[in-house]
Amino acid sequence: MRVGAEYQARIPEFDPGATKYTDKDNGGMLVWSPYHSIPDAKLDEYIAIAKEKHGYNVEQALGMLFWHKHNIEKSLADLPNFTPFPDEWTVEDKVLFEQAFSFHGKSFHRIQQMLPDKTIASLVKYYYSWKKTRSRTSLMDRQARKLANRHNQGDSDDDVEETHPMDGNDSDYDPKKEAKKEGNTEQPVQTSKIGLGRREYQSLQHRHHSQRSKCRPPKGMYLTQEDVVAVSCSPNAANTILRQLDMELISLKRQVQNAKQVNSALKQKMEGGIEEFKPPESNQKINARWTTEEQLLAVQGVRKYGKDFQAIADVIGNKTVGQVKNFFVNYRRRFNLEEVLQEWEAEQGTQASNGDASTLGEETKSASNVPSGKSTDEEEEAQTPQAPRTLGPSPPAPSSTPTPTAPIATLNQPPPLLRPTLPAAPALHRQPPPLQQQARFIQPRPTLNQPPPPLIRPANSMPPRLNPRPVLSTVGGQQPPSLIGIQTDSQSSLH
C-alpha cells in the first residue's frame, strides 16, 4: 500500500473560466438521489400511482421525483404531461442482442450498430437483466432443441408442447407473476433460472431417460428414508433436526479449538526445552594425521579408559577406532603407554589378561613385519649406534707404562685400525705395544692402506735409519729382545 506525500496527487488551483469538461453524447444523467425527509410509505404510494395510472416504471417515476427536487405533489401533477418511452424488447431484439454479444462481448458501441433503435443505457440495462435470467443455453439453442425433440418424439411431444404454451414465450413480462407480486400473496412461488418451459422440458427428459438424469445429493450429503419421514412428520421437525445438528457442529468446533490450544502449548514446550537435550553437532572430518594436542588427548584417554579405544576415539573426535589402535601400538614406547596402562589397571584393580598380551604381541609383530614408507619415532629411537668393527685382531691390553693422559681425555677417540698380518712375517718381528700407543698420538686415525711413520727416539742424536723396519702386529704378546732393550732405554730416558 502506497502511503506518503510522494504518492499524493498535486491538485492545481481552481480556474472558474476553464471549461475542460464538456458534455458527451452518451454521458449518463443522474435520475435519482435519495432524500431523507421523504418517508418510505409516501414514496411507495407515489411509485404505485405512477405505475398503475400512468404506466411509468420505477426508474422513470423516481426520475420525475428527482426532477422536481423530491416534491411529491409537483411530481404527481406533472406525471400526466409526459408519455413514458416504451422499453420493450421483442424476440427479434433479444436474438440480435445475443448474436451481437457473442461476437463483440461487452463492447456496447458495436452492439448498438446492430440495434440502432436502442440506446447504450438501455443495452446496459437489458444486459444485466439478461445476465441474471438467462439459462446455460441461449434462446436459439433452446429453440433448436425443441424443434429436434418434436421431430424425434412425434405426436406425444407435440401434445406436451400444446399443453404448455408458455414454452415458446421468451419475453420478460409475465402477467401471472406480476399479479402475484402486486397481490403480495403468501403462496410460495418456485423461481429458477431456467424458467417454466425449461423445467417441463427437463421433466420430459427425466421421463424418457430416468436413469441418465437421476439427481443425486451433493458430495458428503446422504439421504435416507427415515430422515425424510422424520422431517415431513411435523412442521417443526425440520427445525428440531437442524438445531440438533447445529449443537453437534458447535461441540465439534469446541473440540477442535481445544485440540489447537493443546497443540500450541506442546509446541511452545518443545521449542523451549528441546535445545538442552540436543547432542552437540560435530562437523569434524576423519584425519589420519596426529597433532600434538591429539596425541596428548590419546595418552590421557589411555590413562582414563585403558584399552577402550572406542571411548578414546569419541573423545578425540576425528579419529577412528583403528587409528587409535595403531597409535597405541606405534607410540607405546615413546609415550610409555605400557606404564600408563598399568596405572589404569592398578586403579581399576584388574590386571591385563594373557589373551590381551598375546593379541598385543601379534599386533606389534604385524606392525613391524608390514613394510611401510614411513618410520615412526619409536623405530628411530630403537636404532642405537654400533661401534665399527676392526678388521684385525683386538688390540692388546695397555701396559703399565706411564703415558700422557691429557690428550687421550680430550680426544676420546677409538683405537686405530691395525694392518692385517703378513703371511711370511716371522713371529719374533713384532712391534712393541708402547710404540703402537705412541703412534696413536702422532696420527690418531690411520687408514688401513697407510702404514704408521717410523718411530724416532726424541733424546737420541743418531740419524734415523734409511730403511725403517715395517710395522708388524704382535702375536702372543712377545717381542724381540733387541727391541725390548731399546724400549727399556727409551723408557729410562723418558724417566
UniProtKB/Swiss-Prot annotation:
It is found in: Nucleus. Residues 348-357, 475-495 have a biased composition (Polar residues). Residues 205-217 have a biased composition (Basic residues). Residues 1-83 form the ELM2 domain. Residues 84-135, 285-336 form the SANT domain. It comes from the Eukaryota. Keywords: Coiled coil, Isopeptide bond, Methylation, Nucleus, Phosphoprotein, Repeat, Repressor, Transcription, Transcription regulation, Ubl conjugation. The keyword Translocase does not apply. Residues 162-184 have a biased composition (Basic and acidic residues). It holds the Pfam family Myb_DNA-binding. This is REST corepressor 3. It comes from Homo sapiens (Human). The lineage of its organism: Eukaryota, Metazoa, Chordata, Craniata, Vertebrata.
